[in-house]
């Protein structure tokens, strides 16, 4: 590895092939750039070979093409390979552009790279046009006539420009008498062929510049210090505190052995109803892979982040700025220490059992500046809004809000105190600390909190909450004593 990073030539190969940062969500869409490079190589080799035998003359063009097809070894293959690769070239170019549009490659910090790509496309179109109108038959003649006639649309001077390009009143010996091209290009026997070559080498140069500028800036790979996400985090955007609360409820930190080395993963798995929430989280973070699976016939959607660079650069700063309150923080501390220590072997990983010792007191939790935003995220994960009948044969409806967490007595008690609930925390059948409220005052308190919180519910829980408010308006016990908001 030392010679790869010290040798003047090998270190270039190493930087672009081995150490080059790439998106964690790589897909087949990232193949088009390399396929275009393959097409470019084929076009150069076949184009130079054909040019050796082609005569750019109205009288000799057909004979030279027949010579290529009949007399040159595998000339027919070279010609057809050149023409079909040209079509494939543009097909792949448009797919490559589509990939860039979909993943926002035109945005900062890749704006200049995108602009160079646009120039490459324009030069490619010009090169393809010049290759198309090389003298061979009627299509070349009228192709050149029609395209160059576009200049005639320029008011007053258009027709003069067309005749200047043609070198006369009509296209003949395709612009071989064009003084302008001869002066600019000094291209030898055929200005068109020479101009095509010049443009082709311009394309190669621009592609080299574009590749150099793209290094480290591929769509989906963003520097923490330059990304919008980083700026929002350092500016104190409480959306990230919301995410910490969400991950504390339903997320996990895992270190598992898959193959020879350890895999570090931050993940969250929710019901398919929350698929939009998963994609919103991915959009906020800008990283991660979304996957789907069935568990006992229940559709689930998950977001997983496994790239170590992303974990170090994006995830750890969030959880350092907004620490979790429950004992799941022990899982994070173990995860962080192992990740930063560079442990890759299971044998080097210390044994771990989550401690039962509380990390925080009730007072320290509720006095934390970001607790309200964190609580919205935690409600998104573990909260439940419901309306039910007190008795099956009775029409008397009860509205309830409940929230629970395993081994979370201190945390749930802090939520109880923060929201001024009077109901006691209890252990349910699954050994989770649970809080359930149904009183008018408690329902009013949770509504006021959510309406005035610094962040809003984002997922399916938001729909559940809105439906809950709609049902509350129909229950006189609550609607007569609570000012139920009309929107959220």
Curated annotation (Swiss-Prot):
Region (cobA intron encoded): 170-488
Subcellular location: Mitochondrion
Region of interest (cobA exon 1 encoded), ranges: 1-169
Post-translational modification: The mature protein may arise from proteolytic cleavage of an in-frame translation of cobA exon 1 plus intron, containing the I-AniI open reading frame. Cleavage may take place close to Met-213 resulting in an active endonuclease/maturase of about 30 kDa.
Major site of localization recorded for this protein: mitochondrion
Gene Ontology biological process terms, A to Z: intron homing; mRNA processing; RNA splicing
GO cellular component terms, A-Z: mitochondrion
SUPFAM superfamilies given in the database record: Homing endonucleases, Transmembrane di-heme cytochromes
Alphabetic keyword roster: Endonuclease, Hydrolase, Intron homing, Mitochondrion, mRNA processing, mRNA splicing, Nuclease
Summary of subunit composition and partner proteins: Homodimer.
Note: Residues 237 to 488 are sufficient for endonuclease, intron homing, and RNA maturase activity.
Name listed for the protein in its UniProt record: Intron-encoded DNA endonuclease I-AniI
The species this protein was found in: Emericella nidulans (Aspergillus nidulans)
Lineage, broadest ranks: Eukaryota, Fungi, Dikarya, Ascomycota, Pezizomycotina
Protein encoded by which gene: I-AniI
């Amino acid at each position: 590895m030392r010679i790869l990073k010290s040798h003047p030539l090998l270190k270039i190969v190493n930087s672009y092939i081995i150490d080059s940062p790439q998106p964690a969500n790589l897909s087949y869409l990232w193949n088009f750039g390399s396929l275009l490079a393959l097409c470019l190589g084929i076009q150069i080799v076949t184009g130079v070979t054909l040019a050796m035998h082609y005569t750019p003359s109205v009288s000799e063009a057909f004979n030279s093409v027949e010579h290529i097809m009949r007399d040159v070894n595998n000339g027919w293959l070279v010609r057809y390979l050149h023409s079909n690769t040209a079509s494939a070239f543009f097909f792949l170019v448009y797919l490559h552009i589509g990939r860039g549009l979909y993943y926002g490659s035109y945005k900062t910090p890749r704006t200049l790279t995108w602009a160079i790509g646009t120039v490459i496309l324009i030069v490619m179109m010009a090169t393809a046009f010049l290759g198309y109108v090389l003298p061979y038959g009627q299509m070349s003649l009228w192709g050149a006539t029609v395209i160059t006639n576009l200049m005639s649309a320029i008011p007053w001077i258009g027709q003069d420009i067309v005749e200047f390009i043609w070198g006369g009143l009509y296209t003949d010996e395709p612009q071989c008498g064009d003084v302008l091209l001869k002066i600019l290009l000094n291209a030898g026997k055929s200005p068109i062929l020479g101009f095509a070559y010049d443009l082709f080498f311009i394309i190669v140069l621009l592609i080299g510049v574009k590749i150099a500028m793209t290094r480290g800036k591929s769509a989906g790979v963003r520097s923490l210090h330059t990304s919008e996400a980083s700026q929002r985090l350092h500016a104190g955007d409480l959306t990230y505190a919301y995410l910490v609360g969400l991950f504390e409820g339903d997320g996990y930190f895992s270190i598992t052995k898959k193959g020879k080395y350890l895999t570090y993963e931050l993940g969250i798995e929710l019901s398919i109803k929350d698929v939009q929430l998963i994609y919103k989280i991915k959009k906020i973070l800008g990283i991660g892979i979304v996957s789907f699976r069935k568990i006992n016939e229940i559709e689930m959607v998950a977001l997983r982040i496994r790239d170590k660079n992303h974990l170090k650069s994006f995830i750890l700063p969030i959880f350092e700025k907004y620490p979790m309150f429950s004992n799941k923080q022990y899982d994070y501390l173990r995860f962080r220490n192992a990740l930063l220590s560079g442990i890759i072997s299971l044998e080097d990983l210390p044994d771990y059992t989550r401690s039962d010792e509380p990390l925080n007191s009730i007072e320290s939790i509720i006095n934390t500046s970001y607790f309200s935003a964190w609580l919205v995220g935690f409600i998104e994960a573990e909260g439940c809004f419901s309306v039910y009948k007190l008795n099956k044969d009775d029409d008397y409806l009860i509205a309830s809000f409940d929230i629970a967490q395993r081994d979370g007595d201190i945390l749930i008690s802090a939520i109880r105190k923060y929201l001024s609930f009077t109901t006691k925390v209890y252990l349910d059948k699954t050994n989770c600390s649970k809080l359930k409220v149904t009183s008018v005052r408690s329902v009013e308190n949770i509504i006021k909190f959510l309406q005035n919180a610094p962040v809003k519910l984002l997922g399916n829980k938001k729909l559940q909450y809105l439906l809950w408010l709609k049902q509350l308006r129909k229950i006189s016990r609550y609607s007569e004593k609570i000012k139920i908001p009309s929107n959220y």
